[in-house]
């Protein structure tokens, strides 16, 4: 059941890409506001909002900022954001999924298409690459929360599909239908996770050479630094040495 986290070295770059806290907090606040607007403003009754609040806490976003983002959803003068998923191919034919929340669809599409084109890739139609990914739930805990065996046993009992434990922590995967129940069971045992969300997990990853990898990592940077982009997923692996070289 346990295994290697094939795309972890790409996900690790997210921390560096969002090094500017003001930009990161803006993205987190946007997700909180949208989640609260689509459901109830009570995180205990709104799974998406709870996931957004957990993500904000994990980045040490001040409590006042979180509460302000929730209250913003209750007002009538707040911005309206569209949720859009972009799909395309990066350098080397690598599949890329981009999730965005934008108040200007034309601007977002133009910018993201430009990023793909400049990197030597191309933006495709919705559905053009998502078939190579699985929509799945992920619950993450720090390494120190419990032993690998303890986490594995608890995850199996809770109904998880897979567990990956390593130096970076524990990752528990569950179906889209069951992950909230799994997260609730694990939280009762280990406390609040550092992450609980739905993601696009690549079914397989491809190892790329350093030249292609550098182009791909630059594309990841461009996408993640855009204000409208919330999440980026791709199905490639690069060497740890390249990630370190580029400051990941």
Swiss-Prot record:
The keyword Transcription regulation applies. GO terms for molecular function: DNA binding. GO terms for cellular component: cytosol. One of its GO terms (biological process) is regulation of DNA-templated transcription. Residues 1-21 are annotated as: Disordered. InterPro entries: Integrase-like_N (IPR017856), TACO1_YebC-like_2nd/3rd_dom (IPR048300), TACO1_YebC_N (IPR049083), Transcrip_reg_TACO1-like (IPR002876), Transcrip_reg_TACO1-like_dom3 (IPR026564), YebC-like (IPR029072). Keywords: Cytoplasm, DNA-binding, Transcription, Transcription regulation. Pfam families: TACO1_YebC_N (PF20772), Transcrip_reg (PF01709). It is found in: Cytoplasm. Its main location: cytoplasm. Belongs to the TACO1 family. NCBIfam families: PRK00110.1, PRK12378.1, YebC/PmpR family DNA-binding transcriptional regulator. HAMAP family: Transcrip_reg_TACO1. This is Probable transcriptional regulatory protein blr1534. It comes from Bradyrhizobium diazoefficiens (strain JCM 10833 / BCRC 13528 / IAM 13628 / NBRC 14792 / USDA 110).
């Amino acid at each position: 059941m346990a295994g290697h986290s094939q795309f972890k070295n790409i996900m690790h770059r997210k921390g560096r890409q969002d090094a500017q806290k003001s930009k990161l907090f803006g993205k987190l606040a946007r997700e909180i506001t949208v989640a609260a607007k689509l459901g109830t403003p009570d995180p205990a009754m709104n799974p998406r909002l709870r996931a957004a609040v957990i993500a904000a806490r994990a980045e040490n976003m001040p409590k006042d900022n979180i509460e302000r983002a929730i209250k913003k959803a209750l007002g009538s003068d707040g911005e309206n954001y569209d949720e859009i998923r972009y799909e395309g191919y990066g350098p080397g034919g690598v599949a890329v999924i981009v999730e965005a929340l934008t108040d200007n669809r034309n601007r977002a599409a133009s910018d993201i298409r430009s990023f793909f084109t400049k990197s030597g890739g191309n933006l495709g139609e919705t559905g053009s690459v998502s078939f190579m990914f699985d929509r799945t739930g992920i619950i993450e805990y720090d390494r120190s929360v419990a032993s690998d065996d303890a986490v594995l046993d608890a995850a199996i009992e809770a109904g998880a599909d897979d567990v990956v434990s390593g130096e970076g922590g524990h990752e528990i995967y569950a179906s889209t239908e069951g992950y909230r129940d799994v997260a609730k069971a694990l939280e009762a045992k280990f406390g609040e996770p550092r992450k609980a969300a739905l993601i696009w997990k690549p079914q397989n990853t491809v190892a790329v050479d350093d030249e292609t990898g550098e182009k791909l990592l630059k594309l990841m940077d461009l996408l993640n630094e855009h204000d409208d982009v919330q999440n980026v997923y791709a199905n490639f692996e690069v060497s740890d040495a390249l990630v370190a070289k580029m400051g990941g």
